[in-house]
């Protein structure tokens, strides 16, 4: 059984079809990358996959549970780090993780223990009492990841988890995600950085205009090229015309 099965998803905003019949199969136990240029439909797809946004058509199943007809069972299995994360930022980092853990039904003692372990692992222990509204963008990203992990989900869906994160924290996040997959979990993550996806993911899909243009194992998609070269080939690289922005060179 796949960890995530997305079938014929459609989402339209006015006369723009952001997601256009997109289907995706994420194998259980995989580290799966979702890549595409800005406006390709990645965030909209992930929002529908997690139940944050209702599709106009199509279905989403998490380990056999339909996200829309069986939302309680499906969402209990998912940990989510959405794009443009909005949290209760008048709580401290420690309070926020505990709060999310209690919402997820964890015992208070377990919630406290896991909060401390996550704060330590993500390098936030020294700032645990600081209000989240005073966190940097990278710290906010890390506290969001802690909240996604606290209930030990079976599927993590992460939108740009490495954005605004420093190299040391990024390396720790990679270690956490690798350990999560090694223990039987599944990760679906989006990123604009091909090098991150190439180093971390075993499978991926390239999305453009709300459609999957290529999908499979990393080697299948790359076809012997680097992922960056293959990505540019699939989506169509743009080249700056010689006369463009000529005024920049006039001084």
Spans of model-derived segments:
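Catalytic Walker B motif of ABC-type/P-loop ATPase nucleotide-binding domains
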Residues: 156-160
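Conserved catalytic motifs of ABC-family nucleotide-binding domains
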Residues: 152
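Conserved ABC ATPase "signature" region
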Residues: 98, 102, 109-127
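A short, surface-exposed alpha-helical micro-motif characterized by mixed small hydrophobic
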Residues: 197-199
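ABC ATPase "signature
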Residues: 215-216
